[in-house]
Amino acid sequence: MRTAIPEKLLKIVEEIHERGNVNLTKLTVLKKWFEHPGRLSAFAIWVARRAVARKGKTSGAAAELFREARTLLTGADEVHPEIDRQAAEVLHDRLRDFQNEYREDRWGRIRIVHHWNLVLVEYGLAICLWHSDSPTRGYKLAADYCQNYDPRYGNGLNGPSQTKIGEIVRFMFTLEALEDTGNEQRTSQQGRFQAHKICI
């Protein structure tokens, strides 16, 4: 089902181009899109796959975690991703424990992260496993995926964020088109079933 949300994201890209930086909260427009059944899980797995593809140079335990994530996520359907739940839970816990170091700050506890892409995989798996009905978590995952630190602005949507938002827009267009195709096929099958019943 086609929506206007992707166009709203493209306007954010234009705004970044014009102003240099916009607030991460602009991505809250995604919450409405995530309310549609199945979209949030599909998005979470898509982000996890993108994160695995962007792993960069890694070695040791981090490289092993990336390999396990790639194996788990390979072949999952774009619209209705079904992954091995038990393996996903084990991997999620290993990812969480791998970067489980915190420091105290005046704003509270801050997690120390050395491999951001592994955190994105962890968050994506958590949504797919336990929070597929939480559009707020979907928005936060999108913000974590798109955010960029620039010393002029701090953390926000700037520079490379434009490319990542564009990737999300392409994902949304693809998923909406696949949803439409699936609905058409189901409608066609139902029509054939009804016709068969009438003939009987």
Report the location of each language-model feature.
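Structured binding/interaction patches within domain cores
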Residues: 2-200
